[in-house]
Amino acid sequence: MKLLLDTHIWLWSLGEPARLARHLQRELQNDENELWLSPVSTWEALLLHAKGRIRLHGDLPKWVAQATAHFREAPLTHEIVIAAQQLPLSHPDPADRFLAATAQVLGLTLVTADERLLGLGKIATLANR
């Protein structure tokens, strides 16, 4: 499978793997799966750090390089931006819209714990349950 991790799943996989369901931990460790990450998640993590909601240790560019090293980088294209605007999400969070649209356009499975994204129906998802 080609798995696009949402921001929380990515951060939990790095620092709090116990928050991930066992089946999800297995999928993330399965070498047959491709793990993808959007730069939107990096942006969101840096915003959370700046607001004091999470702590990222050390030099931020170095942290980003290490935290993203094992992931394929999902592009943010005009096609994805248009798809994000057209998604029928119940809230205007741009990060969630971009992640869902990225999964939709690139044919990736979005790994998330967000019920709003899990209930979208227009994209393949893998739940953290």
Specify the residue positions occupied by each region the protein language model found.
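Short, well-structured N-terminal submotif of metal-dependent ribonuclease cores
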Residues: 1-37, 51-64, 106, 115-116, ...
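Active-site neighborhoods of divalent-metal-dependent phosphate/nucleic-acid chemistry enzymes
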Residues: 57, 68-115
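Phosphate/NTP-binding elements of NTP-utilizing enzymes
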Residues: 45
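Short, structured coil segments at secondary-structure junctions
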Residues: 69, 120-122
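Short acidic-hydrophobic, aromatic-tinged amphipathic segments that line or gate anion-handling sites
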Residues: 74-75, 125-128
